[in-house]
């Protein structure tokens, strides 16, 4: 039992909820490879650091000898997951889904062991349900139970439309667990309802219910909302090392600790020691550099991490980038000159244009050559001259 306690403690690290822990202990006691499921709808072509929180947990299960099933929702991706959404998500075409799925398959192996990963597509069984099967599946849940879900409840109360296919989505995801006979399903905290539907459907099918394991959502570069490509507050796992380094160094000191908790493989005791050192006067930038290097080494190499650090020092620290700077958020695309003016970095758009012409404007340490640049969804550090800095998020 002591071995199980050690394994359980490791598996619970960074986890928000385990439903239920008693079920997980019982499954671990069976001393067999458990089927660990993670589903992902390929709604965008790139995987970002937010996705890696659950992928890292999958890899941990692999290291303990369990069978990892990475489910690509090529069928459900055409439906659109409503989790956490305040409006109906537009479904993707099959062509978009399949194109994005190919990219997913390449990128997940930056974390998962390809020899120990089984990739499946849920169209293999959901595509065969037919009308009769879909009606039978829908009969497992009532509209009242669906409206217990927070996002549906909010939209219903605010008289926002909820499409019928959005009610179907949790049932399709739950049916995936039945088809795979999953022992454990991982997901973000916004997936809790869907994971619990899987437990219910497995019980109805005469299977032992899966353990639902939820992990916190990684907050993006803006320090406010979950990391998302659509919000521009993300770091892709295929981003260049220098870009990764600059973006990680741009996050706030408070957010850095959340990222350590969710992204770092360092022992918890070492992270606690870092916190104590910063509390006692150590520059948090030094600790942030260690986080940046750890993440870059994982997706590129240690040599790339060292080079990116040196490049950052050459670009930023010699320019004395401050530890703290003003932060701004703008909605919708905005011209660079207007952004600099609204962020208080220049007095007018004409001054912004003049500073660009004089090589006095930088974005993440890179000189800007075109004053007519339009800034879309993103988070960057903007510098004007030697001493004016601002962290700006465009959504």
Curated annotation (Swiss-Prot):
GO terms for cellular component: cytosol. Residues 334-394 form the S4 RNA-binding domain. PROSITE patterns: AA_TRNA_LIGASE_I, S4. One of its GO terms (biological process) is tyrosyl-tRNA aminoacylation. SUPFAM superfamilies: Alpha-L RNA-binding motif, Nucleotidylyl transferase. InterPro entries: aa-tRNA-synth_I_CS, aa-tRNA-synth_Ic, Rossmann-like_a/b/a_fold, S4_RNA-bd, S4_RNA-bd_sf, Tyr-tRNA-ligase, Tyr-tRNA-ligase_bac-type, Tyr-tRNA-ligase_bac_2. Keywords: Aminoacyl-tRNA synthetase, ATP-binding, Cytoplasm, Ligase, Nucleotide-binding, Protein biosynthesis, RNA-binding. A motif ('HIGH' region) lies at residues 42-51. It catalyses: tRNA(Tyr) + L-tyrosine + ATP = L-tyrosyl-tRNA(Tyr) + AMP + diphosphate + H(+). GO terms for molecular function: ATP binding; RNA binding; tyrosine-tRNA ligase activity. ATP binds at residue 229. It is found in: Cytoplasm. A motif ('KMSKS' region) lies at residues 226-230. Its EC number is 6.1.1.1. It is an enzyme of class 6 (ligase). Belongs to the class-I aminoacyl-tRNA synthetase family. TyrS type 2 subfamily. Homodimer. Catalyzes the attachment of tyrosine to tRNA(Tyr) in a two-step reaction: tyrosine is first activated by ATP to form Tyr-AMP and then transferred to the acceptor end of tRNA(Tyr). This is Tyrosine--tRNA ligase. It comes from Mannheimia succiniciproducens (strain KCTC 0769BP / MBEL55E).
């Amino acid at each position: 039992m002591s071995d199980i306690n050690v394994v359980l403690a490791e598996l619970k690290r960074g986890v928000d909820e385990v439903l239920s822990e008693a079920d997980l202990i019982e499954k671990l006691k069976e001393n067999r490879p458990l089927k660990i499921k993670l589903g992902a709808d390929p709604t965008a072509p790139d995987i970002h650091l937010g996705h890696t929180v659950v992928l890292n947990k999958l890899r941990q299960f692999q290291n303990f000898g369990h069978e990892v099933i990475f489910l690509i929702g090529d069928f459900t991706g055409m439906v659109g997951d409503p989790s956490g959404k305040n409006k109906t998500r537009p479904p993707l075409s099959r062509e978009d889904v399949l194109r994005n799925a190919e990219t997913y398959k390449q990128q997940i192996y930056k974390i998962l062991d390809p020899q120990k990963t089984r990739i499946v597509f849920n169209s293999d069984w959901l595509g065969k349900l037919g009308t009769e099967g879909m009606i039978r599946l829908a009969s497992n849940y009532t509209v009242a139970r669906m409206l217990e879900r927070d996002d549906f409840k909010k939209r219903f109360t605010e008289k926002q439309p909820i499409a019928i296919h959005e009610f179907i989505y949790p049932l399709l995801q739950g049916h995936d667990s039945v088809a795979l006979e999953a022992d454990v399903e991982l997901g973000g905290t916004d997936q809790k309802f869907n994971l619990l539907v899987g437990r219910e459907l497995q019980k109805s099918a005469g299977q032992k219910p899966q353990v639902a394991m939820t992990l916190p959502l990684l907050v993006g570069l803006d320090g406010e909302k979950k990391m998302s490509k659509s919000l521009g507050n993300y770091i892709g796992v295929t981003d260049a090392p220098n870009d990764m380094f600059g973006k990680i160094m741009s996050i706030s000191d408070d957010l850095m600790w959340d990222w350590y908790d969710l992204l770092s493989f360092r022992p918890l005791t070492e992270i606690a020691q870092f916190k104590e050192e910063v509390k006692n006067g150590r520059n948090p930038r030094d600790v942030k550099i260690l986080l940046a290097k750890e993440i870059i080494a994982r997706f590129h190499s240690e040599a790339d991490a060292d080079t990116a650090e040196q490049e950052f020092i050459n670009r930023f620290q010699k320019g004395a980038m401050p530890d703290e700077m003003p932060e701004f958020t703008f909605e919708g695309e905005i011209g660079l000159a207007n952004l600099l003016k609204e962020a208080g970095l220049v007095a007018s758009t004409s001054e912004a244009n003049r500073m660009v012409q004089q090589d006095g404007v930088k974005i993440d340490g890179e000189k800007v050559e075109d004053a007519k640049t339009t800034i879309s969804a993103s988070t960057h550090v903007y510098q004007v001259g030697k001493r004016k800095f601002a962290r700006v998020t465009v959504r």
